[in-house]
């Protein structure tokens, strides 16, 4: 576990988190989504931000998430936790739920937090936060990332 966390901090580009935190202040509507294990990170970040007065939308039901994405406007920031990248890939969940079509037509700014390098190539994803993982102990890495995002948000709020 220690090796995984050390690897994360030594190889992670924090400037991507700085952009995300900036956008938390910029956008009036924020949604944070994920499914399965990635939903844990989404929920944790949402709870932390709400505790500091930043209201964020989050749905556990995947279809509710897709409906939100489909109707999001340009004043909306969507953060998707998907360690595998399947949430946003054309060959992933899109086969069944048309996520590709919804994301491609969305007017929202979309961030994806993932370990999948291929997500960077998707034109309908505006920003990618790549998470370095060494041994697939991503639950620990996910917690470190959520804590880092929240600490940077707190730090900017206090200034």
What do these predicted regions represent?
Residues 25-158:
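Glycine-rich phosphate-binding loops that contact phosphosugars or nucleotide phosphates
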């Amino acid at each position: 576990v220690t090796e995984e966390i050390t690897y994360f901090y030594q190889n992670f580009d924090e400037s991507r988190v700085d952009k995300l935190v900036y956008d938390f202040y910029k956008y009036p509507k924020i949604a944070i989504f994920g499914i399965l294990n990635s939903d844990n990170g989404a929920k944790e970040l949402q709870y932390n931000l709400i505790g500091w007065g930043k209201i964020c939308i989050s749905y556990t039901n995947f279809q509710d998430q897709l409906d939100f994405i489909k109707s999001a406007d340009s004043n909306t920031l969507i953060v998707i936790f998907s360690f595998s990248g399947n949430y946003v890939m054309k060959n992933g969940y899109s086969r069944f739920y048309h996520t590709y079509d919804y994301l491609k037509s969305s007017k929202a700014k979309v961030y994806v937090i993932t370990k999948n390098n291929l997500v960077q190539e998707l034109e309908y994803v505006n920003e990618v936060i790549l998470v370095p993982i060494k041994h697939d102990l991503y639950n620990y890495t996910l917690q470190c990332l959520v804590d880092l995002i929240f600490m940077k948000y707190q730090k900017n709020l206090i200034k």
